[in-house]
Amino acid sequence: MNKVKSISLMFPLYKDRSTVKLMSKKSVKVLKKLKKKYEIIIVDDGCPQNSGKLAKEISKKYSNVKVFFHKKNLGYGAALKTGFKKFKNDWIFMIDGDNEYDVNDLFRLVKASENYDLVITYRYKKKYTTSRILISWIYNAILRLIFNLKFRDISTGSRFVSRKLVKRIKLRSNSPFVGAELAIKAELAGYKVSEIGIHTYPRTFGTGSSVSFKNILLTLKDMFLLFSRI
């Protein structure tokens, strides 16, 4: 039985200046309610909006907030891998910094982690544009086909993973494929993976970059590189 004693909450920043303060405040509130040892890790992935500078100011207000910087934009996967190198606690909650996901889902993720090493999420209803829903559907269909997966949705930005798993699996992807890579390698290595349903919310500030043409190409590249290695 897994007992969650301490949690590291991590989110990357890229063009998320408008939400970093809100995400930090929500995260602190939820983690305090859980009454467990915690830290918040923010990784500025070369953000052009000085989001990291704002995050640094937030870290002065909250001692449990730690901020790390990339000098240039290295990619979503690279930002998460930096967080994986820096976190200190037993479990890590990965969530995007754009406020599309609800930090309160952490309560359910902690509960769902009993007897599992990784808990991924699927979206009950995707409140996105038709094109983004179509891209997500095609992406998940390809993943299920070539990797023989049974997960409903492997492309969400909300996951809860044990330190044991993170430290034993080497992740290579710098693209948004990193989340799928984590789940695929966890299954192949014999770790127990569960999934729960969550609600997502429309982005209220800025525009996301995960479904940009560049990121789609990089994701496909990382996907087929992994497929060629297994």
Specify the residue positions occupied by each region the protein language model found.
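A short, conserved alpha-helix in the catalytic core of glycosyltransferases
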Residues: 165-169, 175-192
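Acceptor/aglycone-binding surface of glycosyltransferases and processive sugar-polymer synthases
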Residues: 68-86, 91, 103-176, 201-221, ...
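A conserved acidic beta->alpha catalytic loop
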Residues: 44-52, 99
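Short beta-strand/loop segment that forms part of the nucleotide-sugar
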Residues: 36-47, 68-70
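Cell-envelope/extracellular polymer assembly enzymes that use nucleotide-activated donors
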Residues: 6-8, 39, 181
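Short, well-formed alpha-helical segments that are part of the catalytic scaffolds
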Residues: 16-31
